[in-house]
Amino acid sequence: MAKKKAFTSLPYLASIVFLPWWISLSFNKWLESWVTNWWNTRQSETFLNDIQEKNILEKFIELEELFLLDEMIKEYPETHIQRRIHKETIQLVKMHNESHIHTILHLSTNIICFAILSGYSILGNEGLFILNSWVQEFLYNLSDTIKAFSILLLTDLCIGFHSPHGWELMIGSVYKDFGFAHNDQIISGLVSTFPVILDTILKYWIFRYLNRVSPSLVVIYHSMND
């Protein structure tokens, strides 16, 4: 019976893992030309936030200062410097334009992907139920020592001493995937907040659920943790 459930739930599990990647790849290619054409036609400034505007101004000022310094050292004529500034400004505008296109593209793709996955989960309720029952049966058959070791390993990975670097990479990757500009302050705030929230949830879960369901597991977990 357990093997039958495992084989039945494997296609559903594989579809959950690979479907988001396939949807993202397909819709990225399909939407790219449409979003590029829409953005270049509308020239909308809706998605220009204060952080992006500040970054562009800083880059432009830095660029101008570098060219002026180069002029003082090499004694270039003023017209030559102006041409270089004009050329680099156009390049900066192109980069800014492409950044906005990628932001809209990634955001649109993620929204579509989330909607399709939500519909798939609702329609595939039977497969989700079989997968859930198989996972519960698999976990139930494990010994308390293995369960305690697994919980300890996961907690050390997620909220341990070395976890902030992993959280920083993961949050930065998600932030980039949604097309937003990199912001150290926001990422640092999330990195310092998420592990604390997870630690609180874990302690509450151990206190409310594990103490009632498997007291021996809690004893083994605390012994390993100490």
Swiss-Prot record:
Any single GO CC term annotated in Swiss-Prot or TrEMBL for this entry: chloroplast inner membrane
Domain of life where this protein originates: Eukaryota
Record-annotated membrane-spanning stretches: 7-27, 111-131, 186-206
Catalytic activity field: K(+)(in) + H(+)(out) = K(+)(out) + H(+)(in)
Pfam families linked: CemA (PF03040)
Chief localization: plastid
Any one Gene Ontology BP term: potassium ion transport
Localization per Swiss-Prot or TrEMBL: Plastid, Chloroplast inner membrane
Protein's membrane topology: Multi-pass membrane protein
This protein's UniProt keywords: Antiport, Chloroplast, Hydrogen ion transport, Ion transport, Membrane, Plastid, Plastid inner membrane, Potassium, Potassium transport, Transmembrane, Transmembrane helix, Transport
Database matches in InterPro entries: CemA
GO molecular function: antiporter activity; proton transmembrane transporter activity
Function per UniProt: Contributes to K(+)/H(+) antiport activity by supporting proton efflux to control proton extrusion and homeostasis in chloroplasts in a light-dependent manner to modulate photosynthesis. Prevents excessive induction of non-photochemical quenching (NPQ) under continuous-light conditions. Indirectly promotes efficient inorganic carbon uptake into chloroplasts.
Similarity field: Belongs to the CemA family.
Record's protein name: Potassium/proton antiporter CemA
Organism: Buxus microphylla
